[in-house]
Amino acid sequence: MKFLYGIVFIALFLTVMFATQTDGCGPCFTTDANMARKCRECCGGIGKCFGPQCLCNRI
C-alpha cells in the first residue's frame, strides 16, 4: 500500500511541476485579494487562478 501512495504522490508532484514550468506565472495565494488580477496581468490578460496555480492557458 505504501508503494501505491508513493506512486500517486510522484504522479501528482510531476503534474504540478509540469504545469508550473509550462505556464510560468507564480502561485495564486488566497490571502491576496488582488491575486486574480495579478495572474491575468502576468499571462497577458488570459490567466486564471486554478487552485493554487496561475495558469495562462485557462479561459
Curated annotation (Swiss-Prot):
Q: What is known of its domains?
A: The presence of a 'disulfide through disulfide knot' structurally defines this protein as a knottin.
Tissue specificity, in the record's words, reads: Expressed by the venom gland.
Q: What is the lineage of its organism?
A: Eukaryota, Metazoa, Ecdysozoa, Arthropoda, Chelicerata
Places the protein is found: Secreted
Query: Which Gene Ontology CC terms are recorded?
Result: extracellular region
Checking Pfam families in the record gives: Toxin_5 (PF05294)
**PROSITE patterns according to UniProt:** SHORT_SCORPION_CHLORIDE
Where exactly is the site Important for the binding to the catalytic site of MMP2? 37-38, 40
Q: What does this protein do?
A: Toxin with unknown function in healthy organisms. On glioma cells, inhibits chloride currents in a voltage-dependent manner (when tested on gliomas cells). Also interacts with MMP2 and significantly inhibits its catalytic activity. May be internalized with chloride channels (probably ClC-3/CLCN3) and MMP2, thus inhibiting the chloride channels necessary for cell shrinkage and tumor propagation.
Q: Which residues form the signal peptide?
A: 1-24
Q: Which cysteines are joined by disulfide bonds?
A: 25-42, 28-49, 39-54, 43-56
Q: Which UniProt keywords apply?
A: Chloride channel impairing toxin, Disulfide bond, Ion channel impairing toxin, Knottin, Metalloenzyme inhibitor, Metalloprotease inhibitor, Pharmaceutical, Protease inhibitor, Secreted, Signal, Toxin, Voltage-gated chloride channel impairing toxin
Broad class of the protein's primary localization: secreted
Further information? Negative results: does not inhibit potassium and sodium currents.
What InterPro entries does its record include? Scorpion_toxin-like_sf, Scorpion_toxinS_Cl_inh
Organism from which the protein derives: Olivierus martensii
What GO terms are given for molecular function?
chloride channel regulator activity; peptidase inhibitor activity; toxin activity
Concerning SUPFAM superfamilies, the annotation shows: Scorpion toxin-like
What name has this protein been given in UniProt?
Answer: Chlorotoxin-like BmK CT
